[in-house]
Amino acid sequence: AAVDEGRSHLAGAEDLGGDYLLPGLVELHTDNLEKHMTPRPGVDWPSASAVLAHDAQIVAAGITTVFDALSIGDVNPKGKRMQQLPKMLEAIGEAAASGDARADHRLHLRCEVSHPQTLEVFRELVEHPLVQLVSVMDHAPGQRQFARLEKYREYYQGKYHLSDAEMDAFIVEQVANSERYSDAARAAIVDVCQGRGLSVASHDDATLAHVRESAGYGMAIAEFPTTVEAARASHEHGLQVLMGAPNVVRGGSHSGNVAAAQLAGIGVLDILSSDYYPASLLHAALLLAGEHSEYDAIRYDLPRAVAMVSRTPALAAGLTDRGEIRVGLRADLLQARALGNNQPVVRQVWRGGQRVF
């Protein structure tokens, strides 16, 4: 095996016609499957069909390794996440075992530490062989992502269609649950993960105290820090700072928190995640590296930008066999071209040397 420049005379060689040949993308945090499980409010879709549709969308975006982010603990009083959880786990496992999945699917357990049942459910699900990443979250109002109470009210009241009275009661309940459960659940979950050698991510750290706590627990990744202060401190403590690719494509955070481009500009952005929109992953990398874009002043070179969606996330999750075009690593590859506005077009995708798209 070899990785060379120049002409090839091998019988099976392909001319990519000037397109990019890139390592297959590695996605650490996507809840895209949930949209396929519930394509409309009140509509439950068969889980096997949902997983295959999600998988097709993932591969078409150039993602060859995906950590499906499944939430434990539903803050929505009318939500079905906890009921859907075992169905999603089973369907992902079956698709992976049967070879029907085109991407390499791993599991990312997102643990809402303020929920009363989270720790109990986590202890059961962490035994699943596909679990390789865990994050700890606390979405209670008045801190982290929702330091501004009006943003919390606007987001959840609109999302869950709550009346003013229901929203007031919801806020009181979430604050009380956070005070009662979060600290103990976070400590217990991290302890289990350390015993199993699983990478752990913090979520929405906003202050130096949050970051010191995360670093003290030995966390590897800082997901979506909400302030420049927290992102800088996370970087200094050796946590890989992860931000949303949609944040780059859209030009800012939908929650009004720090912009990913701002963190890129000061050199503390390490990993991008497609979060809720798979096609944003490669698009964001090309924007950060591209000419004639709003990110011209940042100008990551292409290898650095691509590493944020391939090699760096792979290593952060403990995967050392992928994320780079190098002899001895998996032949997870994609062919893509960039249109004039840095919009990528994925042409072909290979996983383990086999074409899957």
Please annotate each region the language model reported.
Residues A1-A2, G18, G62, V349-G353:
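Glycine-centered positions in the ABC transporter ATPase nucleotide-binding domain
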Residues A1-L22:
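Histidine-rich, glycine-flanked metal-binding segment
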Residues L16-M88:
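Metal-associated gating/positioning segment near the N- to mid-region
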Residues G73-P77, R81-D205, D275:
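Metal-coordinating catalytic core of metallo-dependent amide/deamination hydrolases
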Residues L109-L119, D204-A209, E213, I221-E223, ...:
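Active-site glycine- and acidic-residue-rich loops that bind
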Residues H128-Q132, Q194, E213-I221, E236-L242, ...:
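Glycine-enriched alpha-helix->loop->beta-strand junction motifs that scaffold or abut catalytic
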Residues R180-S182, S202-D204, A222-A231, R250-N257, ...:
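A general structural motif
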Residues H237-N247, G251-A336:
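His/Asp/Glu-enriched, well-ordered alpha-helical/loop segment
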